[in-house]
């Protein structure tokens, strides 16, 4: 399929997509919010009063959902290389979290307190070549895992988008090394042909606490 045909198919699907329509009606910035909502409803992993870090937050729909879930007593810190239009109640930090200065700034926003949830919906710029895209994605997942290990409370949750392919099984095993519970989810809002799945990890193992 040519890039032109692929773009046309994407546009047709986008226009007719119920999640796109629902997101617009509900005021969310992206259909991706329904991937998060489905797993939150199932696993109850964001609660009132929680502190949440949202990595790769643009355009902001996950942060919108997270701030609703944590309420005024909680905190949501969003980070992305891209700018995000302001969202009420969200602390936004623009920059590359793989850089030490940005990572330290993230921790400063938490007032150096441990957080309850780390979200990551990060994806690299897609080239269309799985042999290039998947390793880039796995690298970002590993960096997000590192932040989760260093910033989560012992009972905290790490929720991350992962693409199935080379390195997937190894990443899952890495998460199982650090967390007591790891589950894989394929939300209904995730397109069937997409290789993306979402991993939810919970409860850092005592020996792995930073």
UniProtKB/Swiss-Prot annotation:
Principal location listed in the UniProt entry: cytoplasm
Keyword Acetylation: no
Entry EC no(s): 2.1.1.166
Pfam families attached to this UniProt entry: FtsJ
Key words of the record: Cytoplasm, Methyltransferase, rRNA processing, S-adenosyl-L-methionine, Transferase
Swiss-Prot/TrEMBL catalytic activity: uridine(2552) in 23S rRNA + S-adenosyl-L-methionine = 2'-O-methyluridine(2552) in 23S rRNA + S-adenosyl-L-homocysteine + H(+)
Gene3D superfamilies reported in the protein's UniProt record: Vaccinia Virus protein VP39
GO cellular component annotations of the record: cytoplasm
Binding annotation for S-adenosyl-L-methionine: 60, 62, 80, 96, 121
Active site positions, chain numbering: 161
GO MF annotations in UniProt: rRNA (uridine-2'-O-)-methyltransferase activity
Compartments where located: Cytoplasm
HAMAP family: RNA_methyltr_E
Family: Belongs to the class I-like SAM-binding methyltransferase superfamily. RNA methyltransferase RlmE family.
Physiological role: Specifically methylates the uridine in position 2552 of 23S rRNA at the 2'-O position of the ribose in the fully assembled 50S ribosomal subunit.
Name the record gives this protein: Ribosomal RNA large subunit methyltransferase E
Organism: Vesicomyosocius okutanii subsp. Calyptogena okutanii (strain HA)
